Curated annotation (Swiss-Prot):
An example molecular function term from Gene Ontology annotations: structural constituent of ribosome
Protein name: Small ribosomal subunit protein uS2
Lineage of the species this protein comes from: Bacteria, Bacillati, Actinomycetota, Actinomycetes, Kineosporiales
GO BP: translation
Entry's Gene Ontology cellular component terms: cytosolic small ribosomal subunit
Family classification: Belongs to the universal ribosomal protein uS2 family.
Pfam families recorded: Ribosomal_S2
InterPro entries in alphabetical order: Ribosomal_uS2, Ribosomal_uS2_bac/mit/plastid, Ribosomal_uS2_CS, Ribosomal_uS2_flav_dom_sf
Stretch list, region Disordered: 251-311
Domain of life the protein comes from: Bacteria
Source organism per UniProt: Kineococcus radiotolerans (strain ATCC BAA-149 / DSM 14245 / SRS30216)
Keyword terms: Ribonucleoprotein, Ribosomal protein
Low complexity biased stretches: 269-311
């Protein structure tokens, strides 16, 4: 059975790329067409790449490896933390500190400091032997460490591979992984460089539902790998969300062939393209040049009924 269906990818807006003026020519082979100034990603290729990445992550974890989940943009923060915690893997969803991989020995010392501060009762002025001001300074230090390092507190060595949402934003993490020859599994939007990624998944890295779906798929691969590692059943696999269950129940016979992908994409309406443009989180060209990413609306949330019917 396929890891994910074509219908799930379409409904999550995985096929929406960036505006045509913001693209990387190296991504041309992963693009299906262009419509209304928006690139449409070839989901038929995405399906095969998802299966390949899924198998790699599963085998890596089954042989004792670990996967670090990385995504600091607003659209990815919640799903990165939720899915990583579900399968007990390290994650970074707030800010990437330079040297988290290449200088892990120093980072590990900061983790030890965070654990040391956990033993302090910041409200016990009399028993601590410290003044209120000193306790306040320590509390602020602890809060800062928890925010940046809380997701990797149990990590004792560099990960076996990394899952990254938006390789452009997380370019420091990509560079560090490449220096250490750590395989990179990532979503490739139409403005990304595929040469930086070992296991590519062409797709939308701006829409919340797209990021959530693909991150859940990777987490499911980790869960299955853990099951193989321990030689037993695992209950870590997350049940489908209600909207995903409705999709599958409403169309059990949906085929994932290339002809369907072509027909569905060509039948999409202009409002969908507008949603895709909004999903980029770049309302203005100036914002795009500045690199700031606002929280994007979910692509496909309000897709016209006729688009669903075409699928």
């Amino acid at each position: 059975m396929a890891v994910v269906t074509m219908r799930q990818l379409l409904e999550s807006g995985v096929h929406f790329g960036h505006q045509t003026r913001r693209w990387n020519p190296k991504m041309k082979r992963f693009l299906f067409t262009e419509r209304n100034g928006i690139y449409i990603i070839d989901l038929q290729q995405s399906l095969s790449f998802i299966d390949r990445a899924y198998d790699f992550v599963k085998e890596t974890v089954a042989h004792g490896g670990s996967i670090m989940f990385i995504g600091t943009k607003k659209q990815a923060q919640e799903s990165i933390a939720e899915q990583a915690r579900r399968v007990g893997m390290p994650f970074v969803n707030q800010r990437w500190l330079g040297g988290m991989l290449t200088n892990f020995q120093t980072v590990n010392k900061r983790i030890a400091r965070m654990r040391e501060l956990e033993q302090v009762d910041f409200d016990d002025v009399a028993g601590s032997g410290l003044t209120k001001k000193e306790l306040l300074v320590l509390r602020r230090e602890y809060d800062k460490l928890t925010k940046t390092l809380g997701g990797i507190r149990e990590m004792t060595k560099v990960p076996s591979a990394v899952w990254i949402v938006d390789t452009n934003k997380e370019h420091l993490a990509v560079d560090e992984a490449k220096k250490l020859n750590i395989p990179v599994v990532a979503i490739l939007d139409s403005n990304c460089d595929p040469d930086d990624v070992d296991y590519r998944i062409p797709g939308n890295d701006d829409a919340i539902r797209s990021v959530t779906l693909l991150t859940r798929v990777i987490a499911d691969a980790v869960a299955e790998g853990l099951q193989v590692r321990h030689g037993g059943k695992s209950d870590a696999a997350e049940p489908l969300a209600a909207w995903e269950q409705d999709l599958l129940a409403g169309d059990e016979g949906v085929q994932s062939g290339g002809s369907e992908s072509v027909a569905t994409v060509e039948g999409s309406t202009a409002p969908e393209a507008a949603q895709a443009e909004a999903a980029e989180g770049q309302p203005a060209e100036a914002a795009a040049e500045a690199g700031d990413t606002a929280e994007a609306p979910v692509a496909g949330d309000e897709a016209p009924a006729e688009a669903a019917a075409q699928v």
